[in-house]
Amino acid sequence: MSTAVINADDDAMEPTLQSILDQRSLRWIFVGGKGGVGKTTTSCSLAIQLAKVRRSVLLISTDPAHNLSDAFSQKFGKDARKVDGFENLFAMEIDPNGSMQDLLAGQAEGEGAEGLGGMGGMMQDLALSIPGIDEAMSFAEVLKQVKSLSYETIIFDTAPTGHTLRFLQFPSVLEKALKKISQLSSQFGGVLNGLLGANGALPNGQNLGEMMEKLEALRATISEVNQQFKDERLTTFVCVCIPEFLSLYETERMIQELASYQIDTHCIVVNQLLFPKPGSDCEQCTARRRMQKKYLDQIEELYDEFNVVKMPLLVEEVRGKEKLEKFSEMLVKPFVPPS
């Protein structure tokens, strides 16, 4: 587990994400949790703080809802775009339902996958027969952009819990898929080239050997990234939750699965905390605060070796650069409830 900031006064973990900012070696940061707990707000805010201390930061949404555009009040797409008001913060929203057809189209500069004719269909059918490959192709698109643009830190605003954990398996899925395709190409490449003609050209003019070389290069990149995900110096996962039973249950399940994937996690952000003013006569507020405190106590007991960040429930929605910047400050400076 990564070294985190210690509060010398009480020997407790610092209740901020400052340890992530201080860990200069981090390259991949995942932010995830149950739906509706504030993942996007947290990931955007963390990206803003990281942009202050990193050369370049890329924020990627893999959530089908694509809330980055809403959070920053700026339209993002599948290509990285600079976030308005920042010089070194970029964002993109990728389609988690990308397909092998996209990859084949990307390998060919001409007519795309449709131009491969029956051979392209065979390659696509072969690739899609591997479980999880269809979703995993979005990850290949990310790798292609990240490798060419060399960002210092990449933050993933992930989909709700189940999709997040599948996404973290994608490097392994892609690696197996591309390895299988490469093996089949080695075994039957001669036969295919014979069928295609003397120069081994596909119907769109691309050489089969060239395409397989590109696939193999992609496989090598995926293998490298897969190793980086398991290195606590390079990768960490920030869990986001709210102080309720289902969210706490999902967080525990996610932490257990992350451990099984050998992915580091040592930070939990607890959003939507109520802090009723002393003497408040709001019975609902007091009752809800009592319930929240019960689950917050459980979180602090279960994860005493984690940085647990307590974020207040705000009156207004956190949207736009100014509000996100204000929210982001509370990730590195503990929120002090009004007395």
Swiss-Prot record:
Belongs to the arsA ATPase family. This is ATPase GET3. Keywords: ATP-binding, Cytoplasm, Endoplasmic reticulum, Hydrolase, Metal-binding, Nucleotide-binding, Transport, Zinc. It is found in: Cytoplasm; Endoplasmic reticulum. The active site is at residue 63. One of its GO terms (biological process) is tail-anchored membrane protein insertion into ER membrane. Its EC number is 3.6.-.-. GO terms for cellular component: GET complex. Homodimer. The keyword Cell membrane does not apply.
